[in-house]
Structure formats: C-alpha cells, structure tokens
Amino acid sequence: MGLIEVKDIRVFAYHGCLEEEARIGGHYRIDITVSGDLVRAENSDDLTDTVDYGRITSIVKEQMAIRSKLIEHVARRIHTALKEQWSQPLNWRVRVVKERPPVQGDVAEVTYTVEG
C-alpha cells in the first residue's frame, strides 16, 4: 500500500450561500490524499503507473472554478472527478478548507472532508 498526499492546493473561488461571496470570493485550501496499491509505480519509475499529482491539482482547480453554495458539494464534486479519472481501486480523501468564512465572530476556517 502506498499513500500520496497533495497538500495546500490554494485557490481563490466564489463559493458560499451569501450574494457577497459570489461577488467578492474567498480563499480556499484543498488537501488530497490517495492510498492504494502503488507497488507498480514503485518498481517501474513510470508516471503512467501512478496517480499524477499534477493532474490532481488540475482537477481540483477545474472543480473549484464551478460555483457552489456549500463546500460539502464542492468536496463531493472533486472526489467524484478524481475517482472517475483513475479507475483502479484507490481510497480518496478530499479536504476543503474555507478561510475566514463570513460568520459572526472571529473564525479562522471551516473544513469539510469526504473520503472513500
């Protein structure tokens, strides 16, 4: 079993339930973890035998560009797109962090995680 982690993919996006979030936007961080049988890549040293983290980053940015009201929805879309890109049995974990959400009080971030 192997584990690949792509941490702190930083994106500016326009998610949220408030109208001002659609206009002003906000900062997000996304962490992707994928685990599974990566022994072939360990032995071959060939990019086609592994999960290309450059492609992971592209998929995250593509999905983050599609506006959603909820980070739960964004996380599920990213998760689905990743699973569709790589058909082998892998376990994916997607963590979406919304920095400085517009709520009452001083809140640094809100996080949602989906995996499977």
Task: Tell me the role of every PLM-derived stretch.
Residues 1-116:
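N-terminal, polar/charged subdomain of small-to-medium soluble alpha/beta proteins
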